[in-house]
């Protein structure tokens, strides 16, 4: 049996451990640059894209991959999104900007046309121009039928709400549980 010096054994062991630890890590791609030494201590939040409006909850949910949604009585509040005042402002015709141009799902989500048509930029158009840009009704009767249908649905909903309020609730027993 050949006797090896203890120093060589520890160097070989350290080299094997270092190679084994680095085995599962992926190399950096051009889309994901190597983080700077300063940023290694902070958590980098993965984002698929960056939304133009914080009020667009669907966009925020789609773009920010590691947000935590907390249900509050008034609204659903996203946490972990950074500092909104530092965010670069963008024009509204685009819903969001994709981090990678090679992501077709993101490009479809951010640049699809129906969302841009549905958003009205305050002060950009008069209400008449906004109404004309939407769907034009072929006849006044069609518009009237749509409004009547909406009104009937609202009345049915209000009646159900009133019935639910008036419905007798079972009274709790007066006996204490042990």
From Swiss-Prot:
<feature type="propeptide">
    <location>
        <begin position="70"/>
        <end position="178"/>
    </location>
</feature>
<keyword id="KW-1015">Disulfide bond</keyword>
<feature type="signal peptide">
    <location>
        <begin position="1"/>
        <end position="24"/>
    </location>
</feature>
<feature type="disulfide bond">
    <location>
        <begin position="51"/>
        <end position="59"/>
    </location>
</feature>
<dbReference type="Pfam" id="PF00322">
    <property type="entry name" value="Endothelin"/>
</dbReference>
<dbReference type="InterPro" id="IPR019764">
    <property type="entry name" value="Endothelin_toxin_CS"/>
</dbReference>
<dbReference type="GO" id="GO:0003100">
    <property type="term" value="P:regulation of systemic arterial blood pressure by endothelin"/>
</dbReference>
<feature type="region of interest" description="Endothelin-like">
    <location>
        <begin position="96"/>
        <end position="111"/>
    </location>
</feature>
<keyword id="KW-0732">Signal</keyword>
<dbReference type="GO" id="GO:0005615">
    <property type="term" value="C:extracellular space"/>
</dbReference>
<keyword id="KW-0165">Cleavage on pair of basic residues</keyword>
<feature type="disulfide bond">
    <location>
        <begin position="49"/>
        <end position="63"/>
    </location>
</feature>
<feature type="propeptide">
    <location>
        <begin position="25"/>
        <end position="46"/>
    </location>
</feature>
<keyword id="KW-0838">Vasoactive</keyword>
<dbReference type="GO" id="GO:0005179">
    <property type="term" value="F:hormone activity"/>
</dbReference>
<feature type="region of interest" description="Disordered">
    <location>
        <begin position="25"/>
        <end position="45"/>
    </location>
</feature>
<comment type="similarity">
    <text>Belongs to the endothelin/sarafotoxin family.</text>
</comment>
<dbReference type="GO" id="GO:0031708">
    <property type="term" value="F:endothelin B receptor binding"/>
</dbReference>
<dbReference type="GO" id="GO:0014826">
    <property type="term" value="P:vein smooth muscle contraction"/>
</dbReference>
<keyword id="KW-0839">Vasoconstrictor</keyword>
<dbReference type="GO" id="GO:0045987">
    <property type="term" value="P:positive regulation of smooth muscle contraction"/>
</dbReference>
<keyword id="KW-0964">Secreted</keyword>
<dbReference type="GO" id="GO:0006874">
    <property type="term" value="P:intracellular calcium ion homeostasis"/>
</dbReference>
<dbReference type="InterPro" id="IPR001928">
    <property type="entry name" value="Endothln-like_toxin"/>
</dbReference>
<feature type="site" description="Cleavage; by KEL">
    <location>
        <begin position="69"/>
        <end position="70"/>
    </location>
</feature>
<dbReference type="GO" id="GO:0019229">
    <property type="term" value="P:regulation of vasoconstriction"/>
</dbReference>
<protein>
    <recommendedName>
        <fullName>Endothelin-2</fullName>
    </recommendedName>
</protein>
<comment type="function">
    <text>Endothelins are endothelium-derived vasoconstrictor peptides.</text>
</comment>
<dbReference type="InterPro" id="IPR020475">
    <property type="entry name" value="Endothelin"/>
</dbReference>
